[in-house]
Amino acid sequence: MLETNDSVCELAYQLAYHPVYRSSQFWSMLVSSLSIPALIYFITRKIFFLHFHGNLKCLLIVYFICNLLFSMALCFAFFYQFLIPFFVTSKCQLLINTTLFKWGQICSFLLLTSSMLLPIGFSIERFVALGNAQKYESSRTFLGPVIIFIIIAVDFSIIFSVYKNEPFTEGFYSFILVPSTTASQINMYFFVLLFVKIFNLLLNCILLRIHKKIRIKYYSLSVRYEMEEILQSSKFTFIIRFTHLLFFGFYVVVILFVRIMGESFFNGTLNYSVARGVFCTVPTYNLIIVIIGIKSLRHLNLQRLNKVQSTVQIKSTGKEGSKNYEDIITNYWDSVSSRTP
């Protein structure tokens, strides 16, 4: 047991001063710290003031709050791992306290997986909105909180079942590296989440196609306006899901590849551990999504404004313009005739 501990301490020491691993820690620390004020601004100044229905807004707020809390957890983790080598006096002091590692990783994974599952709620809410377009905007905010509760409860149950028998007896030198006794279950859960996210993105594509087909059936100006609101909000959630899938998909594919190939492929435990630790793309996503979100909202709002203006304007050219002119003249003379004694 002592020999194993010594080998773990030696590995922690080599990782702490490995240039590639060290650079990845610094990058993750930097983007995590930058993403915190960026997400706070995005939530309080953009998401809170969206014109979307309360159900979708509630889902978006909780989704980005999960990202914010996860960024805070990552910021602490990477600051800790980056700075601790400057203050230790022995190699084994580089190992993370077991209790700190246990609760840090469980809470971090719960926030990470919750943010991966919450976009499923976007699809459910959007299909309900599309199916009840004529009266959905006047409905109360109830569906969103229910979906949030169910998704978080399911995710909590899965994470609890994964970690309930984990003894946490290994020496831990990184918050993002899963214990070997739990790694297979976490990998399986991530693999399932990847397929769920792909399926969810396909559902969003189907939703947008259905929207384009049925919106021509509505002639009421108010319903057409509601349909345009649903379309714009669905496009925004599509952008979020697509961006999340790119980053998360890359992370899962790379991590599974590293684990499947094993230590022999990377010529030793050190290179294998470096490969496992440097491909965490989630901190970068938490910063990039704010930039993409602000730009996409600006574009969609401009698109929405132009669409609404074109919808309420009366055309004055072509066959439709001629018909509008005749209708106006007819209505005018009918009103004059009705006032003539």
From Swiss-Prot:
A single MF term (Gene Ontology): G protein-coupled receptor activity
Location of the protein in the cell: Cell membrane; Perikaryon; Cell projection, Dendrite
Annotated GO CC locations: dendrite; perikaryon; plasma membrane
Cytoplasmic compartment residues: 45-58, 125-141, 209-237, 298-341
Keyword Metal-binding applies: no
Annotated membrane topology: Multi-pass membrane protein
Example GO BP: sensory perception of chemical stimulus
Residue ranges of the TM segments: 24-44, 59-79, 104-124, 142-162, 188-208, 238-258, 277-297
Tissue expression as described in the entry: Expressed throughout the head.
Alphabetical keyword list: Cell membrane, Cell projection, G-protein coupled receptor, Glycoprotein, Membrane, Receptor, Transducer, Transmembrane, Transmembrane helix
Topology feature Extracellular, residues: 1-23, 80-103, 163-187, 259-276
Positions glycosylated per UniProt: N5, N97, N267, N271
Keyword Glycoprotein: yes
Function: G-protein coupled receptor.
Cross-referenced PANTHER family: SERPENTINE RECEPTOR CLASS BETA-1-RELATED-RELATED (PTHR31216), SERPENTINE RECEPTOR CLASS BETA-3 (PTHR31216:SF1)
Protein family per UniProt: Belongs to the nematode receptor-like protein srb family.
Protein name: Serpentine receptor class beta-3
Organism: Caenorhabditis elegans
